[in-house]
Amino acid sequence: MENNELVNTNINYSPCILNTCSFGNIINNNEIEIFVSGKNKAKSKSFLHYLTYDFNSKDETQKKETTLLFQTWNETPSKTVNYIIPIRINNSQNESQNSLLSSGAFIFSSQLELLLNNNDDYNLYQIDDDIYIKPNIENDIIYGLVLDIGLKIFDLAKKETKSILYPGRKHIINDYFISSDNKNIIFACEDRKIYVYDKTDGKSFISKPNKMEINQVCEGSNDGKKFYGYSDEDYTLYLYDIRNFNQFVDVVKQDVEITKMFYNKACQQLFFLEFGSEAIISIDSIKQESIYESHKMIKDFGFQEQQKFMNIITEDNSINIISL
């Protein structure tokens, strides 16, 4: 496939409002799993769809779709889900089961249970705080950011939680990510500091205050030694060295707010989306360029890194899949 070749533009959810779309696994060597969360306009119901698509064929009949979750709430949740986490749940023999876990089944509102699906046997936790879920890189482990408190770790195998907190401190955490070597959890907080939690020894490291508050953080290199930080205050991207994260360099200053950024290890580039934009922008150490223009406002994007696929949700609630 040529770069940026359109794989499929016919996955359309026009009667619905889409929130997120993300890739799961590659199955049968030619099919890709896709998770779509959104809300039905007519019925006011939230849903999570699971579908597979044959990326070697452009025939629409090669798409298989099922409803993984269709949950009705008596009251509208205070916030909608922002991220989908496709994880396969392993049993004690480490054999993959057919159960799929996704944050599309999680809701932010207080006093609501976290659900895997409609089966009550899969209720995991009762959460009394607004929770913000992001993708994790470990089987059976979920990292959830609990606003105004800290980071909670949900262990699905043990069905228990623990909090990562710094003694004597309360934190409002803007964003975090887990390093590619699975060693560190990096936090960006409203106090303009960056915190690094070493999972192997439980030690914590705290930076000096930055000039600007950092609102988003993500991986910055394949070796896990660098990471990006972004500030809404001055619309600037910063690149940090995790070995001495008080040192950083300005990467680029934007004219408008960045709403989402993602470091793609396969492409070794940072991809980001500006507010109200119709294009996905990529950046490396040499140049910044627009890699996809939809001519429609883009709501969300994600990657399947093994095959270098990117999915894009546009304002008309359709999903576009391109090959990078």
Locate predicted features.
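Canonical WD40 repeat/beta-propeller blade segments in eukaryotic WD-repeat proteins
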Residues: 16-23, 78-88, 128-135, 170-178, ...
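Conserved beta-strand element within WD40/beta-propeller blades
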Residues: 35-37, 41, 99-109, 142-146, ...
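Short coil/turn segments within WD40 beta-propeller repeats
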Residues: 41-48, 112, 148-152, 191-194, ...
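Blade-level signature of beta-propeller repeat domains, shared across WD40, Kelch, NHL, RCC1
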Residues: 299-324
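Short loop/turn segments that connect beta-strands within beta-propeller blades
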Residues: 54-56, 118-120, 156-159, 199-202, ...
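Beta-propeller domains
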Residues: 2, 35-71, 113-114
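Residue-level detector of Asp-centered blade-edge/turn motifs that repeat once per structural unit
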Residues: 25-30, 88-95, 137-139, 180-181, ...
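A short beta-strand motif characteristic of beta-propeller blades
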Residues: 7-12, 67-75, 120-126, 160-166, ...
